[in-house]
């Protein structure tokens, strides 16, 4: 079962997601409220809405950053290439009709390297296009046990626009990519063992491979003393190796979220926000 603390940790990266400008404090801290409507899993027709107080944390160090929809450590950087350690996660799924009689899905935590290649960057750094190649190991845990559930690879194109649509201070991020998952990952989310098979839910297993596509748009603005932002994401599992799983009830999912945070403290040291 997901505790409030766990949910807050999952939403930290969203609340700190798009705080970008030319010069910003080394760190910022505050508190806010976030709301998001999230499917139980990709391909599920059941959604959960989370409305929770969340911490607002941003750190823009040379080696470790908490921003840009993720917590990541930078191990290597040139003008064209960065090598990061990225983290991600997803909430649990319980009381799902398609999985009735099957074990609930625990929250997952993802971590692994990401190779980021800058394809274009305007001279004023207000427009950036990059290819991101993250490969993350996935574990599931209810904090009483830990289960390894495979790997996920999500190559994507990411476009960041500062002062979007000629509106000063508004930052827009657009991302589109593919999803690939291994056999263990697909077994965790989409397999039906014979013991759980029913007349309406036949046994199913899938190997690893193509797992669909995703498109994300996020917008935010930092005002004096507070921050606002929102996002919308579309996912498709059309053509995925697990598309025919009886646990897949829809081929398309939409995820939306919104957050507002009040910034109570900030570093006097200013640094350039490179993302």
List PLM regions with ranges:
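Outer-membrane beta-barrel "beta-signal"
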Residues: 54-58, 223, 251-275
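Short loop/turn motifs that connect adjacent beta-strands in outer-membrane beta-barrel proteins
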Residues: 21-27, 42-43, 62-81, 120-129, ...
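Residues that define the transmembrane beta-barrel architecture of outer-membrane proteins
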Residues: 27, 47-53, 79, 105-111, ...
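Residues on the lipid-exposed face of transmembrane beta-strands in outer-membrane beta-barrel proteins
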Residues: 33-37, 53-59, 70-75, 111-119, ...
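Outer-membrane beta-barrel transmembrane domain signature
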Residues: 146-227, 235-242, 247
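Transmembrane beta-barrel domains of Gram-negative outer membranes and organellar outer membranes
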Residues: 32-121, 134, 191-192, 196-205, ...
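Transmembrane beta-strands of outer-membrane beta-barrel proteins
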Residues: 27-33, 53, 64-66, 81-85, ...
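Sequence/structural signature of outer-membrane beta-barrel proteins
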Residues: 36-42, 90-96, 118-122, 136-144, ...
């Amino acid at each position: 079962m997901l505790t409030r603390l766990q949910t807050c940790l999952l939403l930290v990266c969203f609340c700190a997601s798009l705080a970008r400008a030319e010069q910003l404090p080394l760190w910022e801290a505050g508190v806010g409220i976030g709301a998001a409507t999230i499917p139980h899993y990709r391909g599920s027709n059941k959604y959960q809405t989370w409305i929770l107080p969340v911490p607002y944390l941003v750190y823009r160090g040379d080696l470790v950053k908490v921003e840009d929809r993720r917590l990541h450590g930078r191990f290597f950087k040139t003008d064209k290439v960065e090598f990061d350690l990225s983290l991600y996660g997803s909430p649990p799924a319980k009381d799902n009709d398609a999985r009735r009689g099957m074990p609930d899905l625990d929250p997952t935590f993802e971590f692994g390297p990401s190779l980021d290649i800058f394809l274009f960057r305007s001279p004023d750094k207000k427009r950036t296009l990059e290819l991101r190649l993250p490969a993350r190991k996935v574990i599931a845990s209810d904090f009483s046990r830990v289960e390894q559930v495979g790997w996920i690879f999500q190559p994507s194109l990411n476009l960041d626009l500062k002062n979007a649509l000629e509106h000063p201070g508004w930052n827009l991020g657009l991302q589109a990519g593919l999803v690939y998952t291994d056999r263990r990952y697909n077994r965790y989310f989409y397999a039906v063992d014979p013991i759980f098979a029913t007349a309406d839910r036949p046994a199913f297993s899938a190997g690893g491979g193509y797992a669909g596509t995703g498109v994300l748009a996020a917008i935010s603005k930092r005002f004096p003393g507070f921050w606002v932002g929102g996002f919308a994401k579309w996912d498709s599992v059309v053509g995925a190796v697990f598309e025919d799983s009886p646990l897949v009830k829809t081929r398309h999912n939409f995820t939306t979220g919104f957050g507002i945070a009040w910034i109570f403290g900030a570093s006097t040291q200013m640094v350039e926000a490179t993302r």
